[in-house]
């Protein structure tokens, strides 16, 4: 297994040596986008294998929701690639330039980082997003996705490599580790420092902690954080209803979904019911403090101190009343 990883690392370093201009980068991404459109049926078929297995092994509902692909999610992946194509090429731009008194001219120029390793969990769209972003920024990437999304990740990586090959670019610019054994992650973190320049973990707390504890490679990552939405006493009601609904229910299983709503006490009587009814009517469970519960006519559960630090990743939300924006900020900073 270690030998396989070393071969992957060596191929990534070789791919990094190939210069690729902006036109070719965008052509590869454009062809990749077309391949996704053309092979939608194949992507959905492979994804079904992952979903069927997830149901069989009784994976948590929020993880299955992350895993499932459909027409809408594939359209989202396509839209993401289109946005990346439109981005200005981030490398070889002169950021700063100055001249010393002795006539020596210095330039600060953006360059690629090098080979990037990305370890992630159950979202198949991460394969496409990360591969596209790394390629646009000139960084070869080694992808290690979770076994729960194995077939979905594999088809996305194969389509990307096919697009690279079509455009005479080293297909090893994008490599997916198709080994399901957990030990491969440990080896990736501890034995690949000669080949990987930075590791990025994308997943839950346990994954990020493991990467931080084991990695001999520099890391770009985060550990914890709860997304909050604060509704001030000067807020517009209709806007607040729309923002809160979108922030919580657009996709409940992502780490960017709102988990706690903070609402100014002065507007609770007017704002509480229309905002929370919208959430409740769309299947969201309400967990609130006493002040909010007194004013909300719908069904809710009493919040405990532990609820303010919970990342539900599902259709649940905590609601707390605050006296002002300072109290809201202090609560978030806890």
Which stretches of residues belong to each language-model region?
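Generic structural signal for well-ordered, non-membrane alpha-helical segments
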Residues: 1, 5-9, 22-25, 29, ...
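N-terminal Rossmann-like NAD(P)+-binding subdomain of aldehyde/semialdehyde dehydrogenases
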Residues: 1-108, 133
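ALDH superfamily catalytic-core signature
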Residues: 2, 122-125, 129-140, 159, ...
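Residue-level signal for inorganic ion chemistry
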Residues: 25, 138, 199, 264, ...
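Rossmann-like NAD(P) dinucleotide-binding subdomain of oxidoreductase/dehydrogenase enzymes
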Residues: 86, 95-234, 238
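Conserved C-terminal structural/oligomerization subdomain of aldehyde/semialdehyde dehydrogenase
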Residues: 304-334
């Amino acid at each position: 297994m270690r030998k396989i990883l070393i071969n992957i690392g060596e191929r990534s370093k070789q791919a990094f040596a190939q210069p690729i201009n902006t036109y070719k980068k965008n052509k590869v991404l454009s062809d990749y986008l077309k391949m996704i459109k053309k092979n939608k049926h194949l992507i959905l078929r492979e994804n079904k294998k992952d979903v069927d297995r997830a149901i069989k092994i009784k994976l948590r509902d929020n993880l299955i929701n992350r895993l499932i692909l459909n027409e809408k999610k594939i359209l989202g992946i396509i839209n993401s690639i289109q946005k990346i194509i439109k981005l200005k090429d981030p490398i070889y731009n002169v950021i700063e330039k100055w001249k010393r008194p002795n006539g020596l001219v210095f330039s600060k120029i953006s360059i690629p980082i090098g080979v990037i390793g990305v370890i992630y969990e159950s979202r198949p769209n991460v394969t496409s997003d990360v591969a596209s972003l790394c390629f646009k920024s000139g960084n070869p990437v080694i992808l290690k996705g979770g076994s729960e999304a194995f077939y979905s990740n594999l088809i996305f990586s194969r389509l990307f490599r096919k697009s690279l090959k079509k455009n005479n670019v080293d297909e090893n610019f994008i490599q997916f580790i198709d080994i399901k054994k957990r030990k491969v992650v440990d080896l990736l973190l501890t034995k690949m420092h000669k080949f990987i320049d930075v590791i990025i973990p994308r997943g839950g707390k346990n994954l990020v902690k493991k990467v931080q504890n084991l990695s001999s490679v520099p890391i770009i990552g985060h550990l914890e954080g709860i997304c909050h939405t604060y509704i001030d006493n000067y807020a517009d009601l209709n806007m607040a209803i729309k923002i809160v609904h979108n922030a919580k229910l657009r996709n409940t299983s992502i780490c960017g979904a709102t988990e706690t709503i903070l609402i100014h006490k002065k507007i609770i009587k007017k704002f509480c019911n229309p905002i929370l009814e919208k959430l409740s009517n769309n299947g969201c469970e309400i967990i609130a403090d006493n002040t909010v519960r007194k004013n909300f006519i719908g069904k809710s559960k009493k919040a405990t101190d532990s609820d303010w630090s919970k990342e539900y990743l599902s259709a649940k939300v905590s609601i707390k009343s605050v006296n002002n924006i300072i109290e809201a900020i202090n609560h978030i900073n806890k």
